[in-house]
Amino acid sequence: LFSSAVTRPEILNGQRKRIFSSAVTATAYRDFGRPSAWSSMVDSLAVDALAETPFPRLFVLSAGNIVDRDHWGNYPASLSVNQIHDPGQSWNALTVGAFTDKVELNEPEFIPVADQGALSPFTTTSMGWEPVWPFKPDVVFEGGNAAANTEFVDNFASLELLTTSASSHRQFWTTNATSAASALCARMAARLMAQYPEYRPETIRALITHSAQWTPAMLRMYPARNKSGFAQLIRHCGWGSPDVERALWSVKNSLTLVAEDSLYPYRKTRDGIKTRDLNLHALPWPLEQLQELQDTQVELRVTLSYFIEPNPSARGSSSRYHYPSHRLRFAMKRQTESLDEFKTRINAAAESEESEHGTTGNDDNWSLGATQRHKGSLHQDIWRGAAAELASCGYLAVYPAQGWWRTRGALQRFDSEAKYSLVVSIHAPEADVDLYAAVETLVENMVENPVEI
């Protein structure tokens, strides 16, 4: 049924660009983040790898709702024990949770359950999942609020979102929870796709996630004082609430760069299937401006988005190493490294069997770090530090890790191409410096040629 809903409009007009949005979920808590038959179908439809001419698709899925009013009354503790519903664990989809800014209600003697900017009482999280599985939700949008008095908790129209009615007897109705949130996300995705029709679905997903920020209320709910704290924050709130204007435009003190590229992760040798390519992206930092800022704090945000092909075997869903066709990683050159030393370090990491420890090193400036950030097929991290220190980095590598294209050589997929989208931004909130103008002429030279491992 799900597959038919996807293919039917494409039969009528196959070349039209679309965003597929689904708010239908299953509530059986049996997967704990592991891929299911349903989520694997979403991943397969998204990447479309088996088609003669692949036509990738972007799926926006609701995270699923908490419907038990008793749980609303136990907010916010209830958020950590209500898992994201199937197929929200899909690697390739954009899974959407809910937060709320709605705190004004018309009912006397009731007060809002959630503070302004906090997670909605209706949203689900991935806190109960095994930590190896993807961070979900990816982002959160407005999903409405609940209200309580001294006796019970309920939802009211004044705390919900206005929408059109399905009934012919009325024009408008209200909606809430992650269904409403996922609809808002699909709208943003459609706006981005209309503005940048040449961008891949992976890039649209990256731009939405890259533009998200946590509200002060989210940071109060889940203080991120260390890397495990950031992981807990993301498993509840995703990367925060996206901003369409931030996704569409670079501003004076903030610069966003987008690269769509590909590499061949593996090759067949006499000694078996080995890693093949890494891509070096020369980041056109405005070096003079960054060096002049010296100790001024700047923020670098990196988002790597790609679609994996799910393992055709049912056994593949049991492990994050066996489920995806391939995995990609990113790492930035350290301040004290030469370019040759950086390449050597990344080569060693790519050849590592599980590729989890070769790039960790000094991760102090990163919110998550190399060990935490590489889950699923959407990786994001934030580097914070002195502008002069960032000016000395300048290169970012994208390289392969383990996947079944490598481990299942009999399927002859080891020579497949892996496409990806990379979004990088620099933000200097405390400085009055025009970062955009400084690099405008350098953007076309972002990517160095692939380097064979």
Regions found by a protein language model. Name each.
Residues L1-I11, D115-S126, T275-E288:
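A Trp-anchored, charged/polar loop motif used as the substrate-binding/catalytic surface
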Residues A98-V113, G117-S182:
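Catalytic-core environment of secreted peptidases
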Residues L1-S90, V103, W173-N176, A180-S182:
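Substrate-binding/access-modulating region of protease and related hydrolase catalytic domains
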Residues Q297-I453:
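Long mid-to-C-terminal assembly/interaction modules of large eukaryotic proteins
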Residues S228-R329:
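Secreted peptidase-domain scaffold signal
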Residues Y196-M221:
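An often Trp-containing, charged/polar helix-loop segment at the C-terminal end
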Residues T27-D31, V67-H71, K102-N106, A146-N149, ...:
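Flexible loop/turn segments at secondary-structure boundaries
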Residues A181-Q195:
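Short, small-residue alpha-helix embedded
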